[in-house]
Structure formats: structure tokens, C-alpha cells
Amino acid sequence: MTTTLQQRESASLWEQFCQWVTSTNNRIYVGWFGTLMIPTLLTATTCFIIAFIAAPPVDIDGIREPVAGSLLYGNNIISGAVVPSSNAIGLHFYPIWEAASLDEWLYNGGPYQLVVFHFLIGIFCYMGRQWELSYRLGMRPWICVAYSAPVSAATAVFLIYPIGQGSFSDGMPLGISGTFNFMIVFQAEHNILMHPFHMLGVAGVFGGSLFSAMHGSLVTSSLVRETTEVESQNYGYKFGQEEETYNIVAAHGYFGRLIFQYASFNNSRSLHFFLGAWPVIGIWFTAMGVSTMAFNLNGFNFNQSILDSQGRVIGTWADVLNRANIGFEVMHERNAHNFPLDLASGEQAPVALTAPAVNG
């Protein structure tokens, strides 16, 4: 008997790299999108940590009044933030090499642009990597579609909104109290709470939380016992098994009796599509709302108070909301503007600024 041995052709270094990048046997899948995601997210994370701890004050309003955001300049975890780049920079791309010195770059808030741009590229690539891994494994592509909701929301507040407002100084600060400040100012300038797209987003997030809790509790309460009473139910299941872990008929029957029959799903695919689509569509709408308000297509406003036949104001909840928004706007950039833009321009409009008399 004759045995023929043929030497295996050695793959080039590039081919080995390609096989490693696209291999689904790695503990963590890299993928071609990952080759860009990993360095950009590492860069954004590193710069964010350094800036959050030690960045000097930033002239955010462009009026030579720097705002300190780092821990070493007196902030704590709650009040600290990476302060957005200066209004003097506007929408200009401001990498380190565009500044005359590192001190100038820090003073004008260069780290904010560095973090935001690398972060956005990183999460875009993470979404692409989700699609790539699904493709390699023969899965359907809906995971990356669902992830597009938070990606679109981040893009709206970090990129679209500053573009619409004309300056990256209007972007969301990278910190806890900075995020709240951004929300309050957004309400003051755009009346976002009265925008229907934001209302859909609230319904999506809160509704998604409710449906998630309902689904999780129903499934956990209707597990099929495959073990004896003295063993843990966990021993009755294995990852990837073909059999159902829980009894959807029992869950459907329980929920149908708790509310009414047609409030419950009896089809697992329809149920899980609903659980995925509800919050995703809601967050998509919120991102679209922020993106349109970026160009000042704002929420509903009721700036004209209701008047009686004598010209007296009939107070409504809209008047309370208007007064709150004006108060927010007065506090915002108080050294850059003498008055809120609503009060400083245009014809005078009757607004209820007097409290009704309380008899009692």
C-alpha cells in the first residue's frame, strides 16, 4: 500500500489575519467592523476618563468665561462632565493639530469633539458588527435593526442637534448633571414635552419596560418542570434545546383570564416581534423628533393666552408651561444673553404672568 503525503500550503500572514478576524470560533467575535470599532471606542473611553478627571475649564459659550467640568477642578461624579467645545469653534472640525497649542485645544473644548466623534464611529461599527456576526452564523438581521434605535438617539443629540443649532457647544455634555441641564434647556427652547414624537418615545420606553416585566414574570411563572421536586428546575434544561422551556399555552391562558382573551399572544414569534418593535419604534420617533427640533421645528406651543371678551387672560396649564420654559431659558447662558430669545425679539404677545386670586 502506498501513502501519498502532500505538504499543506502555508497561508500568508494576511490570510491568517483575515481568517482570525472573521472566525466565529473566537471567544469574542472581532469582524471587519470590529477592526475599526475597537480602536475608536478605546480612544473615546481613554480620552473621556482623562478629560473627566483632569481637563481644565472650557470656554463653552465663547465669551471668555470658562466652565469647569473635571474632578480635579472641584466637581464630583454627579456634577462632573466633559464640557462641549466652545461656541467660538462652532461647527468647525477641531482636532489637536488645528490648535496653536495643547492649552488652546483644551481651553476650547477639543476633547469633547474627540470623544464624541470616536464614540459615534465606534457604535456605528458595533451595529455593523452585529449584522456581520449574524450573517456569519446564518441568523436573521434584526438584532442590529433593534440596536439602531439607541444609535439613532445618540446620533441625534451628539451630531444632528449641534449641526442644526450651528455649534457643538449645543451638544449634550458628557456627564450626569450635564445631561439633565441639556434636557431642561431643550425643553425651554423647543418645548419637547409637547412634541408628539417625544410622546411616542415615552410610550415606547415605558411601555417596553412594562411589557418586558410582564413577559419575564409570565415565562418564569410557567416553566415546564423536567426534574423532581428535590432538584432545581435549571437541571431540566440545556442551552439550545429544541423543546420549549415554558408553557406558552398556560401563560396565554393566565393572561387571557387576567385581562381578556385577545390581550394575550398565543404565538411566540408574534409576541417577541411585538416586544422588540414597540420600544425600537418609539425611540426611532424620539430620535426623529430631536433631529427635527434641531432645526427649530419645535413642539406645539400655546404662546397666545386665552382672553375673555374684556381682554383679560383666562389662565390655563399652557400658561404655566410657558412661564416654566421662560424661566428655564433665563437661567441658561445667563452671561451670554440678556434675555431669552423669545422675549428679546418679535412683537409682544399677551402671556399670563399674574397669579389668580385665591379666595378662602
Curated annotation (Swiss-Prot):
Site annotation Cleavage: residues: A344, S345
Binding positions (chlorophyll a PD1): H198
A single GO BP: response to herbicide
Propeptide residue intervals: 345-360
Thylakoid in keyword set: yes
NCBIfam families named among the record's database cross-references: psbA
Name of the protein in its database record: Photosystem II protein D1 2
